[in-house]
C-alpha cells in the first residue's frame, strides 16, 4: 500500500491566500461598470438597488469604480506578499514539495495573470469599441505569456534550486506594473 504524503499546512495556506486574493481581485474588477455601445446613447436606468453597505476599503462598492480599481490593485499586491512568504516558509520548515510548487504556479496564474489582465480591461472603459478590442487582445496575450512563463519556470526548476536567481521577468513584477498603475490611477483621480 502506498503511503500518502502529508501536505505542509502553513505554506499551503499562504499559497491559497494568494489564490483567494487573485480570485477576489477578479470579482472586484468584474463589478467595475464599463459602458456598452448602447450606454453611450442611452444610460442604463434599471440598476438593482441592494441594501446600503457602509464604505469600507475592502468591500466592493458598485457605485464607486475608482474604489474598486484601487481595491483590485491592493489585492494583487497582497497576493504578492503571500506569494513571497509561501516559498520562504516552506523552505524554512523544510516542507517543499512538487504539490506546493504546482499549487503556487496555479495561484500565480490567477493572481498575477488573470486578475491583472481583467483589471486592465476594466480600467479602459472609455476607449472606443475598436480600441477595446485591442485591449482585450493585449490582456489575452498577457495571460497566455503568464501561463507560458509559469510553465517554463516549473519545467526548468528542480528541487535543489534555491530560487535565488531568476531568468526573465517574474510574473509578480509584471502584475506589479498593472497594479501600480491602478493605484496611481487612484492618486491621480483624487
Task: Indicate residue ranges for each PLM-predicted region.
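Short juxtamembrane and helix-loop transition motifs at transmembrane-helix boundaries
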Residues: 1-5, 65-71, 94-100, 130-137
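A feature for the membrane-embedded catalytic helix bundles of lipid/isoprenoid biosynthetic enzymes
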Residues: 5-11, 105-190
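Membrane-water interface at transmembrane helix exits
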Residues: 27-31, 86, 91, 120-124, ...
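Acidic (Asp/Glu-rich) catalytic motifs at the cytosolic membrane interface
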Residues: 75-118, 152-155
Amino acid at each position: 500500500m502506498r503511503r500518502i504524503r502529508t501536505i505542509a499546512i502553513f505554506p499551503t495556506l499562504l499559497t491559497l491566500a494568494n489564490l483567494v486574493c487573485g480570485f477576489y481581485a477578479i470579482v472586484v474588477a468584474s463589478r467595475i461598470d464599463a459602458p456598452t455601445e448602447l450606454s453611450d446613447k442611452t444610460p442604463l436606468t434599471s440598476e438593482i438597488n441592494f441594501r446600503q453597505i457602509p464604505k469600507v476599503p475592502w468591500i466592493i462598492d458598485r457605485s464607486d469604480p475608482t474604489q474598486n480599481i484601487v481595491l483590485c490593485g491592493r489585492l494583487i499586491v497582497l497576493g504578492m506578499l503571500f506569494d513571497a512568504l509561501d516559498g520562504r516558509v516552506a523552505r524554512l520548515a523544510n516542507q517543499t514539495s512538487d504539490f506546493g510548487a504546482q499549487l503556487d504556479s496555479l495561484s500565480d496564474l490567477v493572481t498575477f495573470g488573470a486578475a491583472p489582465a481583467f483589471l486592465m480591461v476594466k480600467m479602459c472603459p472609455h476607449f472606443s469599441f475598436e480600441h477595446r478590442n485591442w485591449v482585450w487582445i493585449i490582456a489575452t496575450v498577457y495571460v497566455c505569456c503568464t501561463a507560458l512563463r509559469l510553465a517554463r519556470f516549473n519545467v526548468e526548476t528542480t528541487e535543489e534550486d534555491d530560487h535565488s536567481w531568476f531568468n526573465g521577468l517574474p510574473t509578480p513584477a509584471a502584475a506589479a506594473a498593472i497594479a501600480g498603475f491602478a493605484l496611481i490611477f487612484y492618486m491621480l483621480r483624487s
